[in-house]
UniProtKB/Swiss-Prot annotation:
The glycine cleavage system catalyzes the degradation of glycine. The H protein shuttles the methylamine group of glycine from the P protein to the T protein. This is Glycine cleavage system H protein, mitochondrial. InterPro entries: 2-oxoA_DH_lipoyl-BS, Biotin_lipoyl, GCV_H, GCV_H/Fam206, GCV_H_sub, Single_hybrid_motif. Keywords: Lipoyl, Mitochondrion, Transit peptide.
Length: 163
């Protein structure tokens, strides 16, 4: 039992997760720090992702972000309204800290993931699927072009973690 506790503490300190992510295998890349980065998404330097499809964009925090936060115990989400690129729209509380979540794009919120109220841990276990935060109708789709692709974001995370 002591060995299991030591291994768990070491994994937490190193930011290593053993949570199964095999369902993500077809379109992912792994950075040196073992964060999952999906192809086909756009990424902000503040560690949020955007999946744009049709007239709606889905927004959440990245695997890299949740790994640095630790176990998320509470998520405060907006009830609706507008979001502005680079401005906070939500906050998440983990065992380590409370952090603002910035919107990578501007627009009108059309849906909020209410599952996160009862299950904030979805931000840890499924940040790109069940742990999405809001869906937004973008007001300025050109903002998506200023965000990073998967390769750029992976490199960004590696450089950030090296410092």
């Amino acid at each position: 039992m002591a060995l299991r506790m030591w291994a768990s503490s070491a994994a937490n300190a190193l930011g290593v997760s053993c949570a199964p992510k095999s369902h993500l295998l077809p379109a992912l890349s792994l950075s040196r720090c073992f964060s999952t980065v999906l192809d086909g998404l756009k990424y902000a330097s503040s560690h949020e992702w955007v999946k744009h499809g049709g007239s709606v964009a889905t927004i959440g925090i990245t695997d890299h972000a949740q790994g640095h936060l630790g176990d998320v115990v509470f998520a405060e989400l907006p009830e609706g309204g507008a979001v502005s690129a680079g401005k906070p729209f939500a906050s998440v509380e983990s065992v380590k800290a409370t952090s603002d979540v910035n919107s990578p794009i501007s627009g009108e919120i059309v849906e909020v993931n209410t599952k996160l109220s009862d299950s904030p841990g979805l931000l840890n276990s499924s940040p790109y699927e069940e742990g999405w935060m809001v869906k937004v109708k973008p007001s300025n789709p050109a903002e998506l072009e200023s965000l990073m692709g998967s390769k750029e974001y992976t490199k960004f995370c590696e450089e950030e973690d090296a410092h």
